[in-house]
Amino acid sequence: MKTIAIIGKPNVGKSSLFNRLAKERIAITSDVSGTTRDIKKQVIEIEGNEVLLVDTGGIELKETGLFGKVRELALRAAKEADVVLYMVDGKMRPQDDDISLFRALHRENEHLFLVVNKIDNDKEKERGWEFAEFGAEKLLFISVSHNRGVGALQREIADVLGLEAPQEIVLSEDDEEDLEEYLVSLEEEEIEEIEEAPSEIRVGIIGKVNVGKSSLLNALLGSERSVVSDVAGTTIDPVDESMEIEGQKVLFVDTAGIRRRGKIEGIEKYALDRTQKALEKADIALLVLDCSLPFADLDEKIGGLVDKFSLGVIVVLNKWDIRSREFKEVEKEVRHRFKYLEHAPLVTVSAQNGRHIDMLKEKILKVYENFSRRIPTSILNKTIMEASARHPLPSDHGKIVRIYYATQYGVCPPQISLVMNRPNSLHFSYKRYVVNFLRDRFDFEGSPILIRARKRGEKLQDEIEALGED
């Protein structure tokens, strides 16, 4: 028979969970620390299968005598169990001795769950992600007193133990709450992973004068909507045109071409101002480069607007039919000149003959998908903890710098907050490392990733605005 051991410090709710899983009051529960001194055992059912549940005494690392014996028995029970539920009090902050014991137990038993109890609502659950620093593969939030998350815990246990539920299940009244909770959890996960489809994707077309922006717009639309001329600077006002790509409405803004500062006069100053205002509202920028000519410093400065407005980006290599170099050579120069756009995909096109225009349309949708990507909180925290385990944060003059947990508080672009003990000590190079680590795990091609650091209990201004708080 499979064995499940509940272990943890006194008064974290072990006996209450034992009673909840056993569906009867067997273990005595009390607010007095250390009420449970003997190991309690009870055969229970999980997914229609019998398992042995073991309620250990509360562990105090420094206790001797009676409580030292309790600790010894509890640790032995944990080593012998098939699954260990290490419980902590979610109302308290993570304790170093808990972390040390948890990691020691993990060396003895690979099926070790970290169960954070007393998480009574979603706000407390967000704070509960501080416990991600334990490095647990299975991190579960429950409230035994509110019967919150207990059903999900049972399903995780069944999954690890390979317990298969009977094909026909008749739900009792008690089980209906678990089922409802499970369905709600599925809905919440769906909400985290899938953002509501945008009413329209706003795409700004930017580049120097006469690189073919208006020709590109006409090629995308399939008709001549924007005036095309060999005279540099024909487009003065941004031109808005919309179309549908695979059922998704896309609004294109053909912006005015940008000249070197010394040559900007009168009405073109107005045009530059209008262009920047258009980009403020854009989601994605198509940075158009003329491949029939050498790239210039001005191309780099225009590319800087993408970084300034944190836009999704595609580098469009136009006039590819009359290019003077091969792709590898062009790609090498683009990556060298536009280091801040290393995440941008490159698409070769010819606005004149329609080459790769359909490919560009598909890439616009893909980049927007990445630009609006939301990582489920549990997966995000596991990824951040893996990153910090592989490459620990540098200390700050001998003081430990630690990431407690992470939350993604915004999309378009993805915005992630790292909750830390010393946020001011997060070096830009480590921030870049975290961004690159996320790019290795998830598809963020064409999208910037914004990383912020803050203390516990604080919210940054953009985080407050994203959450709609006062």
Curated annotation (Swiss-Prot):
Residues binding GTP 2: 207-214, 254-258, 318-321
Family: Belongs to the TRAFAC class TrmE-Era-EngA-EngB-Septin-like GTPase superfamily. EngA (Der) GTPase family.
GO molecular-function term, one example from the UniProt record: GTP binding
Assembly description: Associates with the 50S ribosomal subunit.
Protein name: GTPase Der
Gene3D superfamilies reported for this sequence: 3.30.300.20, P-loop containing nucleotide triphosphate hydrolases (3.40.50.300)
UniProt-listed SUPFAM superfamilies: P-loop containing nucleoside triphosphate hydrolases (SSF52540)
Domain called EngA-type G: residue spans: 2-165, 201-372
Listed CDD domains: EngA1, EngA2
Gene: der
Domain of life: Bacteria
Annotated residues for binding of GTP 1: 8-15, 55-59, 117-120
Domain KH-like: from-to ranges: 373-457
Signal sequence coordinates: none
Keyword Repeat (UniProt): yes
Keyword field: GTP-binding, Nucleotide-binding, Repeat, Ribosome biogenesis
UniProt keyword Iron, yes or no: no
Pfam families assigned to the protein according to its UniProt record, in alphabetical order: KH_dom-like, MMR_HSR1
InterPro entries the record matches: G_ENGA, GTP-bd, GTPase_Der, KH_dom-like, KH_dom-like_a/b, P-loop_NTPase, Small_GTP-bd
